[in-house]
Curated annotation (Swiss-Prot):
Record carries keyword Oxidoreductase: no
Function: Binds directly to 16S ribosomal RNA.
Name recorded for this polypeptide: Small ribosomal subunit protein bS20
Record GO terms (molecular function): small ribosomal subunit rRNA binding; structural constituent of ribosome
Gene3D superfamilies per the UniProt record, alphabetical: Ribosomal protein S20
Any one biological process term the GO annotation gives: translation
Database matches in InterPro entries: Ribosomal_bS20 (IPR002583), Ribosomal_bS20_sf (IPR036510)
């Protein structure tokens, strides 16, 4: 248990930061799922448009260090490859 005023404040801040970071991680997963859903539907134009919008979200979350930049790059790379494979 936090005994000093500073420790109590840091504990409160940690709870708030955890909630905020969790919501951002959820936004990342939602963005990836939206692109995957469009790919599964077979609509390349829609998938490309959703992917274009999702890239900003993915990069933004990586810039805030909620997820590692390499994980964000891996998501974008795999989604891009899946969209390109739709034409083949």
């Amino acid at each position: 248990m936090a005994n000093s005023a500073q420790a109590r404040k840091r504990a409160r801040q940690a709870v708030a930061q955890n909630a905020h970071n969790s919501s951002l991680r959820s936004r990342l997963r939602t963005a990836v799922k939206a692109v995957r859903k469009a790919i599964d539907a077979g609509d390349k134009a829609a998938a490309a448009e959703i992917f274009k919008n999702s890239q900003a979200t993915i990069d933004s979350i990586a810039d805030k260090k909620i997820v590692h930049k390499n994980k964000a790059a891996r998501h974008k790379s795999r989604l891009s490859a899946a969209i390109k494979a739709m034409a083949a």
